[in-house]
Amino acid sequence: MMQAWTPEGMAFLQDAMACCGYYPALARRIAPYLPKQAHVCDAGCGLGGLSVALLPYCRHVTAVDRAAAPLENLRQRAGHDPRLTVRQGDIRCLPPETPYDAMVFCLFGGVEEALTVARQQCRGTVLLIRRDYAYHRFSTGRVPVGFTAADSEDTLRHLGLSYRMERFSLEFGQPLRSLEDARRFFRLYDRSGGADPPLHRLTAGPGPEFPYYLPNRKELCLLAVEIPAMEEA
């Protein structure tokens, strides 16, 4: 299901991106798996935080997403960096002129869908970044999340594919300007329909602009699959 990119949601995410250093830290985890001088596709890039963070580690990044709003936001933030190409549309219908050296699917799409696209568009490494937890973090109830690490491993084993795997955790909490902002945030992201926002989860924020903070330590799993090995399977 395509994410609904509202101005309010994008504003919250930009605040988190600016304060947490999540995407630069994630890019450092991904970098050792990239071929030298790689052309990398960030599939389902959203606001492009990871796309921009990957630029120091490769020759070029192509950021692809279906939604227009986050891509326009990315273009405004990134300017005219010649190392970055932004493309709007269905990744399945946007093959590159020359196959990518690596493709990153970060919390986006199922394994079989990602591998189908990668077989057609990539000649090197497919990197799947998956949640390593079962329930949605910003909901008051227990709401399952999709595309988990366990599900992805099961699929790769079923397909008979070899892969490299790395588990780690990164902080990606939400800085908040006021308690009213916190209430708005929970109304936007609480998928359990809880009536009362769990304000007790807030801690002191990083500074005067953001006096409140909602911690969120994300357990993640990186799964790396090589296209040549897929062709032999």
Per-region residue spans from a language model:
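A short, conserved alpha-helix within the catalytic core of class I
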Residues: 109-121
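Conserved beta-strand signature within the Rossmann-like core of class I S-adenosyl-L-methionine
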Residues: 123-136
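Conserved Class I S-adenosyl-L-methionine
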Residues: 167-233
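Conserved SAM-binding loop of SAM-dependent methyltransferases across substrates and taxa
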Residues: 47-57
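Conserved SAM-binding strand-loop segment of SAM-dependent methyltransferases
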Residues: 80-91
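Conserved SAM/SAH-binding beta-strand->alpha-helix loop
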Residues: 67-69
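Conserved SAM-binding loop
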Residues: 74-75
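Conserved class I S-adenosyl-L-methionine
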Residues: 1-34
